């Protein structure tokens, strides 16, 4: 590659110039499209993986129809509770709470509410939760990777300033106070998306290599996602609640990571014990 070719390489990632399109009077928001695309991939791929494990057709779709609305409500409530100034502060506006199309969904509220809805729904239908969890775990990471592109369109939740060639350009209207025009920022949406895609690939490979079952992949998903989320959170500069000088989402991620590690260890240990008992019975 010669000097001229090097000079023509991009030295930054541009933010999209538009995040909203109109179909007549109806606004079509990129943020919503990214979330919907992620949900579609999760349901489509999750259904294939679930049926490959002996599950019934359309169970993943039916479960998603319950879990997604609950997850959106949970995600919004988590955001409102952890970022209260925009809604309850001196200049807050309660009317903004239901306006999710402007952004502001806390992933932990979505995961918690969605997971509870899934568990209750599957229990009601008398379906094996572990098999379902095993099937959808990697698909969640892909869905979250696609959903993160919504932050790119909205020009939000980016990281600290950087001089790296993949720094993110932000329009003047979205530029945080105190930063000069032309400042480049860490594209945390891209970091998290790539981490999640790599994590999904790892889950698929590990599941096949070690014949994971019974929800092992879901525990591993919790560990992989939270490990990535912790280092990404340390890059971000948006306003956030802090506890002992550490962002709330870092604390939440650390707790969920520990739960995932514990669940992963106990589930694998339990399955190993069952396998040893089964081998002993066969020898007899």
Model-derived segments and spans:
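A feature for loop-to-transmembrane-helix boundaries and adjacent hydrophobic helices
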Residues: 1-284
């Amino acid at each position: 590659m010669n000097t001229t070719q090097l000079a023509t390489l991009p030295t930054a990632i541009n933010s999209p110039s538009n995040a909203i399109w109109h179909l007549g009077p109806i606004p079509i928001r990129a943020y919503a499209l990214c979330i919907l695309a992620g949900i579609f991939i999760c349901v489509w791929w999750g259904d294939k993986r679930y049926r490959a494990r002996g599950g019934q057709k359309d169970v993943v779709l039916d479960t998603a129809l319950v879990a997604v609305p609950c997850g959106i409500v949970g995600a919004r409530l988590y955001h409102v509770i952890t970022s209260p100034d925009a809604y309850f502060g001196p200049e807050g506006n309660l009317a903004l709470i239901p306006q999710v199309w402007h952004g502001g969904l806390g992933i932990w509220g979505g995961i918690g509410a969605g997971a509870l809805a899934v568990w209750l729904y599957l229990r009601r239908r008398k379906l094996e939760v572990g098999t379902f969890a095993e099937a959808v775990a990697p698909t969640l990471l892909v869905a979250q990777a696609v959903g993160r592109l919504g932050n790119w369109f909205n020009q939000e939740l980016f990281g600290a300033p950087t001089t790296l060639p993949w720094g993110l350009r932000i329009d003047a209207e979205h530029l945080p106070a105190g930063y000069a025009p032309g400042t480049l920022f860490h594209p945390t949406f891209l970091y998290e998306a790539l981490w999640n895609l790599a994590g999904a690939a790892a889950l698929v490979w590990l599941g096949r290599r070690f014949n994971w079952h019974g929800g092992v992949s879901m525990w591993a998903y919790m560990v992989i996602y939270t490990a990535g989320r912790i280092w990404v959170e340390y890059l971000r500069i948006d306003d956030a609640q802090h506890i002992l000088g550490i962002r709330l989402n870092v604390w939440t991620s650390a707790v969920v990571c520990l739960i995932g590690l514990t669940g992963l260890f106990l589930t694998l240990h339990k399955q190993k014990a069952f396998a040893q008992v089964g081998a002993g019975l066969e020898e007899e």
